[in-house]
């Protein structure tokens, strides 16, 4: 097998891996969003029906929203759902367009690296502190940054590979 065929095989395996990871992230986000709804409903029922609102429900809902958002942001990067300046890029000559799109994805990947690193630093710093309403480490607030950052780097790399190969990343929800 020649080098080009090997590269194509690795590239397609990586694309399939990223597509599955993106689908898994979407499914997990949906499950977590349902958990947010249940948590908020439990709080409302507790407050208005039983006259005793559970103290943990709001804190859990806020925590879950962070995870849903982090997963959604990462999937948005893969599926090109993030804000972009398409009109300016489309006016450029083809040779410049490719270079600019690669630079954009490198910037997004750099952001993902910084976000993941910062999240990790804060998670390790806050590991010994407990969230009073949930009795879990404060670190759980920063883990979504790590997860989203890693996913953003993986998905940005997928876009760069696709651009260099002259391909497009197909959204995972297709």
Where are each of the predicted segments found?
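Alpha-helical transmembrane segments and membrane-interface helix-loop junctions
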Residues: 1-174
């Amino acid at each position: 097998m020649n080098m080009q065929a090997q590269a194509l095989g690795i590239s397609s395996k990586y694309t399939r891996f990223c597509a599955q990871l993106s689908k898994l992230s979407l499914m997990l986000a949906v499950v977590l969003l349902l958990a947010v709804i249940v948590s908020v409903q439990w709080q409302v029922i507790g407050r208005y029906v039983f006259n005793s609102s559970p103290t943990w429900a709001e804190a859990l809902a806020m925590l879950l929203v962070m995870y849903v958002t982090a997963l959604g942001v990462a999937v948005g990067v893969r599926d090109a759902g993030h804000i972009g300046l398409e009109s300016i890029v489309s006016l450029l000559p083809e040779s410049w367009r490719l270079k600019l799109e690669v630079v954009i994805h490198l910037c997004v990947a750099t952001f993902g690296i910084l976000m993941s690193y910062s999240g990790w630093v804060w998670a390790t710093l806050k590991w010994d502190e407990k969230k009073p309403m949930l009795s879990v480490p404060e670190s759980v607030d920063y883990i979504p940054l790590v997860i989203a950052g890693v996913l953003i780097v993986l998905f940005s790399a997928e876009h760069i590979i696709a651009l260099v190969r002259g391909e497009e990343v197909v959204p995972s929800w297709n």
